């Protein structure tokens, strides 16, 4: 008997490659519609004449055991004769990665064979199908349940006949749809965007008595390792096997050498149990708690207290860290964002290594989880390789500061007597664990307040006394004051939580800041990033100021990558100023799992006493803990770096070769053999300066917040070229203010009411417009244009424009936008004179032309003002003839009186 099977292609979105197994990409196939008894002979061929496909067409003879199945590759349109010794159900795989093709496959079957009962969801009554299957001599049947296709084996026939197929359909489709949503996948029939899902996808489920373990997710199907489907027909929120194996379809690259194999997919499983279960069931039935939450929390507490390396934690201990990571309001957006980032990366350049997983999660979150990660013993790497294959700085803490991220931390470490059952402070939001992560805003309802003293330890109190400080929860300022005359900060009426402290950093001296609880009460997670933990009961804090003289940007470093996928392993800092070498270890696996072969070794030798220090990284390092390893050195110490492979240790801009490279610590730099101190260190410092300046340009909010990077830029610029003003705009306020001009144009109307303020700060590339509320308009006596503000870019395009007739109502508005050198400002005022004022650094400029039209051009640091249009070649002139009949002069408005902007 003849059969013809036509199968479409599986179209891949741009982020998915042929041969990858994610989201069931190779699971689609079409049944021939028969069951072949053992030893059945048949012929098969594919029609290549019209299809246009470039890969073999695959026919599979499936049953319930991989050891008795067969795969047939059709490479041309010639007939192939086949005889198979085992009962089987023939299928044709959908060609993967092709577009706009249909594969046609022809079968000629000799001898008897059995029709395969097939059910397509919602196309006929279920009972009609079950009746057909019940009466059929076939032990097999095939189900199309939208997002899952299921080959039911003979051993599961009775179980399938007893199953509610509508509920089975709902069970599988809800799981896959939810996992798609968690990953941010969007249905798209054209599959041509970075977030496109796989069109017409479906998981393929079968039995496999020869399969590994209890069940598995494979490239071509998911199956229990049994001759029957077992739990794959059990509809229950506790069916961990099914939700676990389906979750593997979404592992992507997140489990590659991250110690998260069987963790990442289970974090999705936990989320769907979270969705399905009510509060009581969540505690009793969820796999992460199993009615033993207090005991599991105690285990986590012991691991933290003992500083156990996170990579050595147990399976479910690591999993529950993700439970608490994803529980907060926007926690799941972290998961969606990191998946989107992966797809962008895969679409753009799959050869570039992915970021270290903890850095990746940190930069994908809407809240700041860095302190939480440190608590459990993982350290996000602060470097990554960008799309141009260049190692760049994440600046994780500054990025969080610029984005106004709130810091989440376990509630039990904030309200130290909190207990979910016995003392929960009647908190109204849903919490399921004493380790749930909260922010200060969520704890206001407790009405717990503290007066906290921050003791400042500094060599020169005059650098900070009387200076303002503030405390922030994300973007919200919750407290502000000034440093008291005794050199301390006093916080009054502050609720519990982790805040960001914006502390003064000195005036003409710069400092590094370190924040911690009092030494006798080491509760606070000490840090250099101004994360201020206010506990209940509260403790006082200690803020230690250490003079900052030599910029960190002048410190050379090396970047260590993994052997196979170039994953980020460690940063090595060679600090000649502090005479230290510091290793920041971010990944304990540099190569193959469980392999103890030497991967990297550093030996530091003291030339004066012959002593040496050694730091070793094997391919796998289960006993190492992520974090910092610091070694003291002396001038002329030799630092021997031994690499087992080439091209995985980047020093400066050069990948070091396999074998040994010896560096020497000089007073101001580290050099390779046969080299002598030269200007190369300054060149590398200048390159880092420009890179970090670009970072501040990208996160311009940091230009208005005192921070260590601005200190570092100032100190490094003084080292590279003290006379240069290239980096002035990035300096700390104390050093930047003398170069900062703030121009305020103020428009007034009838009764001298303020209509509009236009403020321009050229050095910071910032313009701000504040428009007042005036229902009657600027001046009700005029029905014509009364005033106008317009800014244009260097191409003449309008950046901002606002105008009103005299009797045209005004409503309040506030605009903030960037302006650059060469931008022009055009102002019109119907009644010039006192109705249009220019205030420079809080001083009224009395020489503003008293004309209706005022023109100005922005330069790098100042504003050129006149009453006629300013040509490009006049931009830098201080006194220039405009060429008009009145010989009007254009001046640079300047003053010696500065303000802290």
From Swiss-Prot:
The keyword Glycoprotein applies. Glycans are attached at residues 265, 278, 339, 349, 540, 594-595, 642, 683, 698. Keywords: Glycoprotein, Late protein. Residues 27-330 form the Peptidase M60 domain. PROSITE patterns: PEPTIDASE_M60. Pfam families: Mucin_bdg, Peptidase_M60. InterPro entries: Mucin-bd, Peptidase_M60_dom. Involved in disruption of the peritrophic membrane and fusion of nucleocapsids with midgut cells. This is Viral-enhancing factor.
């Amino acid at each position: 008997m003849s059969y013809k099977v036509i199968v479409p292609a599986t179209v891949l979105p741009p982020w998915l490659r042929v041969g990858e197994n994610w989201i069931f990409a190779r699971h689609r196939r079409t049944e021939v519609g028969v069951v072949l008894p053992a030893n059945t002979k048949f012929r098969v061929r594919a029609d290549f004449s019209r299809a246009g496909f470039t890969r073999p067409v695959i026919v599979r003879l499936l049953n319930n055991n991989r050891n008795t199945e067969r795969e047939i590759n059709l490479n041309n349109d010639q007939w192939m004769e086949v005889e198979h010794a085992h009962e089987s159900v023939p299928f044709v795989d959908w060609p993967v990665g092709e577009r706009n093709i249909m594969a046609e496959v022809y079968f000629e079957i000799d001898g008897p064979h059995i029709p395969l009962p097939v059910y397509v969801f919602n196309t006929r009554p279920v009972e009609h199908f079950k009746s057909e299957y019940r009466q059929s001599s076939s032990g097999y049947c095939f189900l199309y349940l939208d997002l899952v296709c299921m080959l039911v084996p003979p051993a599961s026939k009775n179980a399938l006949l007893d199953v509610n197929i509508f509920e089975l359909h709902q069970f599988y489709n809800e799981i896959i749809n939810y996992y798609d949503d968690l990953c941010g996948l969007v249905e798209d029939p054209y599959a041509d965007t970075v977030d496109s899902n796989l069109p017409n996808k479906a998981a393929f489920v079968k039995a496999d008595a020869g399969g590994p373990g209890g069940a598995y997710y494979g490239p071509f199907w998911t199956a229990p390792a049994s001759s029957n489907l077992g739990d794959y027909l059990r509809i229950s929120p506790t069916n961990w096997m099914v939700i676990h194996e389906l979750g593997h379809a979404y592992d992507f690259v997140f489990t590659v050498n991250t110690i998260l194999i069987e963790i990442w997919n289970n974090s999705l499983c936990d989320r769907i149990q979270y969705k399905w279960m009510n509060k009581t069931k969540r505690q009793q039935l969820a796999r992460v708690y199993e009615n033993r939450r207090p005991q599991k929390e105690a285990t986590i507490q012991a691991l933290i207290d003992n500083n156990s390396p996170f990579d050595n934690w147990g399976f479910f201990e690591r999993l529950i860290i993700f439970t608490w990571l994803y529980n907060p309001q926007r926690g799941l957006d972290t998961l969606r964002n990191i998946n989107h980032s992966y797809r962008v990366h895969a679409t753009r350049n799959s050869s570039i290594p992915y970021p270290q997983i903890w850095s990746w999660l940190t930069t994908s979150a809407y809240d700041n989880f860095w302190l939480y990660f440190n608590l459990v013993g993982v350290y996000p790497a602060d470097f990554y390789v960008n799309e141009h294959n260049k190692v760049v700085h994440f600046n994780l803490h500054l990025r969080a500061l610029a984005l106004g991220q709130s810091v989440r931390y376990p509630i039990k470490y904030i309200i130290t007597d909190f207990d979910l059952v016995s003392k929960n402070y009647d908190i109204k939001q849903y919490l399921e664990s004493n380790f749930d992560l909260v922010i200060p805003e969520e704890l206001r309802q407790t009405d717990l307040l503290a007066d906290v003293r921050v003791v400042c330890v500094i060599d020169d109190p005059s650098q900070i006394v009387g200076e303002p400080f503030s405390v922030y929860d994300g973007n919200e300022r919750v407290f502000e004051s000034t440093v008291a005359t005794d050199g301390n900060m006093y916080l009054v009426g502050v609720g519990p939580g982790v805040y960001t402290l914006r502390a003064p950093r000195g005036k003409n001296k710069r400092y590094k800041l370190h924040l911690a609880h009092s030494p006798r009460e080491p509760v606070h997670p000490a840090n250099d990033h101004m994360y201020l933990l206010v506990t209940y009961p509260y403790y006082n804090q200690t803020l230690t100021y250490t003079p900052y003289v030599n910029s960190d940007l002048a410190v050379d470093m090396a970047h260590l990558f993994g052997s196979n996928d170039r994953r980020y392993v460690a940063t090595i800092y060679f600090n000649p100023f502090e005479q230290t070498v510091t290793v920041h270890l971010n990944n304990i696996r540099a190569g193959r799992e469980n392999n103890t072969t030497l991967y990297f070794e550093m030996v530091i030798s003291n030339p004066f006493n012959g002593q040496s220090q050694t730091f070793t990284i094997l391919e796998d390092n289960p006993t190492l803990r992520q974090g910092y390893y610091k070694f003291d050195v002396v001038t002329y110490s030799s630092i021997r770096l031994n690499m087992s492979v080439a091209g995985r240790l980047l020093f400066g801009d050069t990948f070091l070769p396999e074998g040994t490279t010896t560096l020497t610590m000089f007073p101001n730099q580290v050099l390779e053999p046969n080299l002598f101190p030269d200007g190369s260190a300054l060149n590398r410092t200048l390159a880092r300066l420009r890179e970090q300046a670009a970072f501040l340009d990208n996160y311009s909010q940091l230009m208005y917040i005192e921070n260590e990077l601005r200190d570092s830029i100032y100190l490094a610029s003084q080292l590279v070229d003290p006379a240069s003003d290239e980096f002035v705009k990035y300096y700390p306020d104390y050093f930047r203010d003398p170069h900062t001009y703030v121009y305020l144009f103020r428009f007034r109307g009838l009764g001298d009411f303020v209509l509009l303020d236009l403020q321009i700060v050229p050095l910071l590339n910032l313009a701000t417009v504040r428009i007042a509320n005036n229902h009657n308009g600027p001046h009700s006596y005029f029905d014509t244009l009364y005033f106008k503000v317009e800014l244009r870019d260097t191409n003449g395009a309008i950046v901002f424009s606002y105008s009103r007739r005299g009797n045209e109502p005004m409503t309040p508005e506030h605009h903030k936008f960037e302006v650059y050198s060469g931008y022009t400002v055009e102002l019109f005022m119907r009644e010039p004179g006192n109705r249009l004022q220019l205030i420079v650094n809080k001083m009224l400029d009395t020489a503003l032309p008293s004309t209706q039209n005022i023109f100005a051009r922005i330069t790098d640091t100042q504003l050129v003002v006149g009453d006629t249009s300013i040509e490009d070649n006049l931009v830098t002139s201080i006194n220039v003839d405009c060429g008009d009949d009145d010989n009007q002069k254009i001046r640079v408005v300047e003053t010696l009186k500065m303000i802290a902007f």
